[in-house]
A protein has these predicted regions:
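Bacterial N-terminal signal peptides that target proteins for export
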Residues: 1-5
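Bacterial Sec-dependent N-terminal signal peptides
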Residues: 10-37, 176-185, 199-202
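Extracellular and analogous surface-interaction loops
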Residues: 28-30, 72-84, 156-162, 169-174
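Post-signal-peptide N-terminal segment of Sec-exported extracytoplasmic proteins
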Residues: 37-79
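Short, solvent-exposed S/T- and G/P-enriched segments that are highly enriched in secreted/extracellular
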Residues: 62-82, 123-138, 151-152
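Mature extracytoplasmic domains of secretory-pathway proteins
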Residues: 64-117
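C2-type phospholipid-binding modules
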Residues: 106, 110-131, 135, 144-147
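C-terminal partner/receptor-binding element of secreted or periplasmic proteins
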Residues: 128-201
C-alpha cells in the first residue's frame, strides 16, 4: 500500500512524495526492473500564452527535451540499473505577443518510479506539485512572464537498494526555488491515474 511520508510547501505550488514498500517475506530472486514515470499537465490557457518545453532525465542519465503540444505530457522509461537519478522541468516561455486578458495558468509536474528488486520487494515513490492547487490569474504579459519563471523542478535519486530521496537536478533555469518534498494523497492519486495504476493504492 502507498502511504504519504511527507508534505511540505513550495513558493508557487505545494509539493509532496509518497512511497510504498512491500515487506512481505522474501521471494525467489528475480530479475531487477525499474520503471520511471514523468507527467506534466497544464491548463488550457498556458498553451495560448506560452511555449512549453519538457526537460527530463532519461534512464541513462541523459538530459533530453521535448516540445509540449497538448495540455498533457506523459513519459515512461524502463531500465534494470540502480542507482539512478530522475528529474523533470517544464520550461515555460511566454509567447512574443501576449494580449491583455483573463488567463488561468497552472502547471502540475510529477516524477516517480517503481522498482521491482531482485529480492522480491517492490518499491514505489514519487514527487510532484499539487494537482488540486488553484490556478494563477494573469491579465498582462508581465503577469504571464512572472508565472512562467516559477515552473518547478522535480528531482530524485534512487539508491541501489531501491529507495529514493529528493535531489536537485540542474536544468539551467534562472529560478533558485527548491522543489523538494513528498507525494501526499492528492498528488499520489492523480499521478497513479495518469500512469495507469490504481489510485486506490494510495
Amino acid at each position: 500500500m502507498l502511504a504519504a511520508i511527507m508534505f511540505c510547501g513550495f513558493t508557487v505550488t505545494v509539493l509532496s512524495a509518497c512511497s510504498s514498500d512491500n515487506d512481505d517475506k522474501t521471494e525467489t530472486p528475480q530479475e531487477q526492473t525499474v520503471k520511471m514515470f514523468y507527467v506534466v499537465e497544464v491548463s488550457d490557457d498556458v498553451l495560448k500564452v506560452a511555449d512549453v518545453e519538457v526537460n527530463y532525465v532519461d534512464q541513462t542519465g541523459a538530459k533530453l527535451k521535448e516540445v509540449m503540444t497538448s495540455k498533457e505530457w506523459i513519459k515512461a522509461l524502463d531500465t534494470k540499473t540502480l542507482p539512478l537519478t530522475g528529474g523533470i522541468w517544464a520550461k515555460i516561455t511566454p509567447k512574443s505577443a501576449v494580449a491583455p486578458g483573463d488567463y488561468q495558468l497552472k502547471v502540475t509536474t510529477a516524477a516517480g518510479y517503481e522498482a521491482k528488486l531482485a529480492n522480491g520487494k517492490s518499491v514505489f515513490d514519487g514527487y510532484g506539485s499539487d494537482p488540486e492547487a488553484a490556478p494563477t490569474a494573469a491579465q498582462t504579459a508581465e503577469d504571464v512572464a512572472a508565472w512562467c519563471a516559477k515552473s518547478p523542478i522535480v528531482g530524485f535519486t534512487v539508491s541501489k537498494e531501491g529507495y529514493a530521496k529528493e535531489t536537485k537536478v540542474d536544468f539551467g533555469r534562472n529560478d533558485d526555488d527548491d522543489s523538494d518534498n513528498g507525494l501526499a494523497t492528492d498528488i499520489c492519486r492523480w499521478f497513479l491515474s495518469k500512469i495507469g495504476y490504481n489510485p486506490d493504492d494510495c
